[in-house]
């Protein structure tokens, strides 16, 4: 008889754990919370701002990359499956350039209006895949927003590799809620 009570207690713990996870996921959806798993930005929980208004440099944004770019990220293992068109997850990045900004990619990083964002060009990613830099000498951004992995700029997959994104790709401005800074 005692074995039955032990199994019931163990099953009860699993039921409570599953209910807790379901409740946590429901609350995250209700309050527009996101969890970032990647080291590009601090790992942890973020919440989406209801009405971001005008996008500004320095804001953290959630972005569904253009389909072709996102599919490449999924294929290379940079992105997981998710809700964006093409079946990949949104990315969380810092916005470093907005329409009207002057952008130049150098060996050291991304130069925006003469401000350098450290992001050295790398030839191979951490999986040994060849990396292609976005071919930019110097451009003036028209309707493009440039993204930057501020937490781990050396290995982040950001606009230096695929260029800017349209406003329509930006899902919203998000802010950290409970995060920790971990780099690769």
Predicted ranges, named:
Residues 1-90, 160-184:
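Protein maturation boundaries and topogenic segments
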Residues 7-22, 110-120, 131-139:
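Catalytic phosphate/metal-binding cores of nucleic-acid and nucleotide-processing enzymes, i.e., regions
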Residues 45, 101-102, 109, 143-145, ...:
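Structural motif
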Residues 53, 95, 101, 137-138, ...:
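Residue "hotspots" at secondary-structure boundaries inside conserved domains
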Residues 56-60, 99, 141-142:
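Short, flexible surface segments
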Residues 86-119:
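Mid-length scaffold segments of soluble, non-membrane domains
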Residues 121-182:
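Acidic/glycine-rich C-terminal interaction modules and beta/coil loop segments
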